[in-house]
Amino acid sequence: MSASLKRTPLADAHVAAGARMVDFGGWDMPLAYGSQLEEHHAVRRDAGMFDVSHMLNVDVTGPDATAFLRRLVANDVARLTVPGKALYSCMLNPQGGIIDDLIVYFFAADQWRVVVNAATADKDVAWMQRVAAAGSYDVAIAPRRDLAMVAVQGPNARARVWAARPAWQAATEPLTPFVAAQVADDTLVARTGYTGEDGFEIVLPADQVVALWNDLLAQGVRPCGLGARDTLRLEAGMNLYGQDMDELTQPDQAGLTWTVSLKDPERRFVGRDALEQFAAPRGFVGLKLQERGVMRAHMAVYTPLGEGEITSGTMSPTLGVSVAFARVPQGVQPGQTVEVDIRGKRVPALVCKLPFVRHGKAVEHS
């Protein structure tokens, strides 16, 4: 391990479990603990858990917190009125490019939380502070590096969490997707995830996370690394920041139009002017390879309307074929066949709506 890499509170537990550690956005993180394939299937069929403590929880509080977040993110947080409810959004630059994708939690009009990606965390906090200062918003922006985070995912994930922490069941069993409950001081359980499966993401004080991890292990929850996390999120049609979108990519070029709210003409969020003036020349689609081979990022895609490029690709453990996301010319439609350049050979691929897998089952594409 490089001395410059950051470590989560679970780093020693990963090494003790035999994890292969890699640099992920400046963090020393587990790639896999053995078989990446078995970890993937554990989440689809039973329950797996991921250390996501490298992601940053940021508390946004103060009298102007709601107005500030309505300016900061492209989705409209005013939709959130039930404490614990969350939404997914992008934070844009003035050109409409994506600074980061994130989840926003509402607790009260003056009390919110934003969860941002690890590799962009410092940049995100600096941008939030800049937007707050520019608009003279009366808000406090507090990064919470004292917290850790574990995602427990799979059809049996919730039951395993309740077995490990019975006291949490009453507050968390009624939760619907994208809703969180506070179960103890600084302990939040949200029915969210990045796999396409049911489960919880649990935020808790860093000094309590090793005990939770060990108790979940004792309940048979399988530790999973970044490798399985990537194949799971790809099957589920979920973007990865820095891979499928970045500051040069607008939401509609990354299949994220649904995360942008233009309903309130008075809400001038950062990047709105650019989005209203610019029609994206490229769309975002799923691809399913029709022959043997594996699609990977940056491979060329040939369509009747011009050339595109794969942003993420893998072999799908659930489907047994290669799947990918691609940025292609607008007008390329699901059901059409395109060609992918794999080592100089053009291989046919079916254009698909996302996701490829929903709740462990293949989504039919034709």
From Swiss-Prot:
One of its GO terms (biological process) is glycine decarboxylation via glycine cleavage system. Its EC number is 2.1.2.10. It catalyses: N(6)-[(R)-S(8)-aminomethyldihydrolipoyl]-L-lysyl-[protein] + (6S)-5,6,7,8-tetrahydrofolate = N(6)-[(R)-dihydrolipoyl]-L-lysyl-[protein] + (6R)-5,10-methylene-5,6,7,8-tetrahydrofolate + NH4(+). GO terms for molecular function: aminomethyltransferase activity; transaminase activity. It is an enzyme of class 2 (transferase). It holds the Pfam family GCV_T. Coiled coil: none annotated. GO terms for cellular component: cytosol; glycine cleavage complex. Keywords: Aminotransferase, Transferase. The glycine cleavage system catalyzes the degradation of glycine. The glycine cleavage system is composed of four proteins: P, T, L and H. Belongs to the GcvT family. This is Aminomethyltransferase. The gene is gcvT.
